[in-house]
Amino acid sequence: MNRLRTAVTAGATAALLLTACGGPDEPAGGSTPTGSRGSAVTQERCRDNEAAGTITYVTGFQYQASASILDPIAARALGYFDDLCLDVEIQPGTGETAQNAQLVAAGTAQVSSIAGNGDVLVNVANGVDVRAVAMFGHVPVATLMTEPTTTDLKQLEGTTLGQKGALPVTIEAMLRTAGVDLAQVTQVVVGYDPTVLVRGQVQSLTGYKSNEPLTLAAKGEEVTQWNPEDYGVPGSMATTIVNPRFLTEHRGAVEDFLRAQLKAYAYCEEHADECVADAAELSQAGYDTDHNVQVWQTEDRLVRDSLPAGQVLGQIDEAAVRTEGDFLVRMGQIPAVPDLSTVVVPDLVPSLYDGDRLVWPVP
């Protein structure tokens, strides 16, 4: 989710890794492993992957069934990591993208999902050293919701807009492109209950395509979604970052982590209920499985519908990152686009495929 947050305390960073997690030897609930230790790699590759030690993976937000969160959870539950001789520990992230990036840069975690390329660029601009190795959605996940009576965004002038602490930069750009005078829109911070919109407390509400609209639809409420991409605003979702030193020393392990994740992604497309049950097992209490199945299916559609022709699932390309970086410069989010050769690893995911077929097992 494109939150573009940059501040986090050292205490919060340390506290994250004290939360409950799934350790490398504790498979989760809905899925049953079908392989065996090392069954998908050579003995030499198995030894190399084991030499990488435990890989700590931090989710983007708790155990939500989002792209780049549900698939690693399922990869572990299905035994795919074990098939590749990888020991993976899953930690729930808080949703603070800066926190995830700092954990990875420090080597406290080796891999993490992060909201999108924009969040990577903001963190790198703030001196956080990470590498982006994969990306799933080539579209912003943010949306702006209104009642159906709003037929033109300029109608929002003189009304109240609810946001979660900051107006997402993609939403701001959309409104400006539509000619909205933001000085004429009152912005208020609201919580995560989207019914504030249908109850008339706000006249527009920021959210995520895979979350608040689903909640409102389940309550029988009809809203209009205004999406940044319809106004030419670039964006992305579900980017995977890794620690640079770990990537240099254990590139094969990073490749195989992503290989298992991509295999699990395809599995979850056909077995959403089972994969969400794996996430629910990790969450343990208060997990809305029906809603999370919808989250996964919505994000999967966004990922598949936005996949550029000629690219494979998970591929991150430098040109798209540059386009997003140029946009962030124009919006005043970063001073300049960093040297992308030191940020993006565009060849890693394509190397896992033979044409459009994921290579499994590893030769």
Tell what function each PLM region has.
Residues 138-144, 236-240, 244-245, 325:
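Small-molecule pocket liners
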Residues 29-190, 195-199, 203-207:
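Short, glycine-/small- and polar/acidic-enriched structural segments
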Residues 17-20:
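C-terminal motif of bacterial Sec signal peptides marking the signal peptidase cleavage site
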Residues 250-333:
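Secondary-structure end/capping motifs
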Residues 192-288:
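Pocket-lining segment of extracytoplasmic ligand-binding domains
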Residues 321-363:
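Conserved C-terminal helix/tail region of periplasmic/extracytoplasmic solute-binding proteins
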Residues 22-25:
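Bacterial signal peptide processing site
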